[in-house]
Amino acid sequence: QSGEPAFSATDCILAGTQKALKQVDAIDPNRLGLIGHSFGGFETGFTITQTDLFATAVAGSGIYDNASFYLYIQDEGDPAYFQYEENQLRIPQNLFLDYQGYLDNSALYHTSTMNTPLLLWSGKDDHHVDFNQTLDFYMGLKRLQKPVTMLLYAGMHHSAYKHFQQIDLCLKVEHWLDHYLKGVPAESWVK
């Protein structure tokens, strides 16, 4: 829905999950995980502030504070506001005309309602979505003593292009999901 990208995404995710739970008996409703990267990270981060349906979540390189990201200059030198007004994030009014709408659709400002264990990750050299989006969300969650772990990768851009980064991230995400969905004991980096 235009003007409410985070709430619309949450509605879609929850509707799809509920439909899958009704149609597939093999799905354990107590062992659901949610994972997303980039726009999917934005969706994942926000969704778990609105529901406790998921046992765990993983969000990579997402936008968690729309107000601060709006004026960010991305890799190609373009301001991020085009993504809101004309693209994926679908908030047609600019930040200065709909400030509250930008805050309402930001996971950062809903951290107090988040209970789902969350693994955040980002590349320190991400110039598409600044890694400070991840860092700020992490710090907000830590300040409220929420269950969160953050991985920051030096030399990584918006995605894991280097093989060793892909391997490390893949193994850590797999372990995170194994721990929270299958009860595998946590490795030291999880705590």
Q: Which sequence ranges carry the predicted segments?
A:
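Active-site-proximal cap/loop segments of hydrolase catalytic domains
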Residues: Q1-K191
